[in-house]
Each structure stands twice: as C-alpha cells, then as structure tokens.
C-alpha cells in the first residue's frame, strides 16, 4: 500500500479503534448532527480487517436508528451480512463519527416510511429519483440497512 493510500485510510482506522457508543442511543453530538445532516459517509471492514472506501449515502434518521438503501449484492451489504461494523461520519468526512451495528432488513413498509423523508430532504427524490421504493424491496432488488449505535 502506498503512503497516500494509507493516509486515506487513517480516519477509518481511527474510527475502528474508537470505543463504540454505549447504551441504546447515539452520542448527543451525533444525534444532533443526524437530525440536520443531508448525508452520512459510511464504510465497512474488509475480510482482511482493513477499512473499505468511505462513501456518501442519503439516509433517514428516526431518532433511534439510521436507515439507508443499497443493492443486495453490494460490498456494503455483503460485509454487513458477514458481521462488519459500520463506520459512520455525519454530514461530512470530518464530522461527528461513530461505529454502528448494521443489519439488512427487507421490509417494504420501512421503504414506504423512508420515501416521504427522502422527498423532504432531497429535491431529486421528490421527482422520484433515488427514493426508497417498496416494490424494489419486495422484489429483492434493494435492501434497507438499519444502523444502531454500538458495534
């Protein structure tokens, strides 16, 4: 691995090394940021223990958990199934961060609940683009990732 490549991994390594938030709620700083942020940045852990690339995703936060969608065969989904913790930065790559427990859910009702929130937060979702679709969840083309505090 080259020095520049390693430098890009250092923030993710620091989060992996951090102590997870205890209890059943997010830390106050993360909770506040989740209520106003338009996106989160997420990463997982590879089989070799190294952090994956960190990517921005749109999300819904209901005060208890974070929800976002991904493809069932995506690297994120496969690593979550394998038990990888989810590394989360809120709002920006240097924003509040934590390690979360992620699970895949396949409930079209959750996608239906997410859609109006996406419409409110993201103008392009209001047009029908990139919005959670219950039918795609029902057909297995999309899965929902639920993220809870802790690892």
Model regions and ranges:
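Bacterial N-terminal signal peptides that target proteins for export
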Residues: 1-13
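Hydrophobic h-region of N-terminal signal peptides that target proteins for export
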Residues: 13-24
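Short, basic/aromatic recognition patches
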Residues: 25-34, 39-40
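Hydrophobic alpha-helical segments typical of transmembrane helices
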Residues: 26-29, 55, 76, 114
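Short, P/G- and charge-enriched loop/turn segments at secondary-structure junctions
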Residues: 28-30, 45-46, 130-135
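Extracellular/periplasmic catalytic domains that process cell-envelope and extracellular macromolecules
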Residues: 33-35, 51-53, 60, 81, ...
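Short beta-strand segments
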Residues: 37-72, 86-89, 97-101
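Short, structured beta-strand-loop surface elements
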Residues: 73-151
């Amino acid at each position: 691995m080259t020095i520049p490549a390693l430098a890009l991994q250092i923030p993710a390594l620091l989060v992996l090394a951090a102590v997870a938030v205890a209890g059943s709620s997010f830390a106050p700083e993360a909770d506040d940021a989740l209520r106003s942020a338009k996106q989160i940045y997420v990463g997982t852990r590879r089989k070799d223990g190294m952090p994956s690339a960190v990517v921005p995703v749109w999300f819904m936060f209901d005060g208890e958990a974070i929800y976002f969608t991904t493809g069932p065969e995506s690297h994120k989904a496969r690593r979550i199934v394998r038990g990888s913790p989810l590394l989360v930065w809120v709002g920006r790559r240097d924003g509040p961060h934590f390690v979360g427990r992620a699970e895949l859910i396949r409930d079209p009702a959750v996608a239906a609940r997410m859609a109006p929130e996406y419409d409110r937060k993201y103008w392009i979702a209001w047009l029908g683009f990139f919005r959670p679709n219950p039918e795609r969840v029902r057909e297995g083309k999309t899965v929902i990732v639920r993220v809870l505090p802790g690892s």
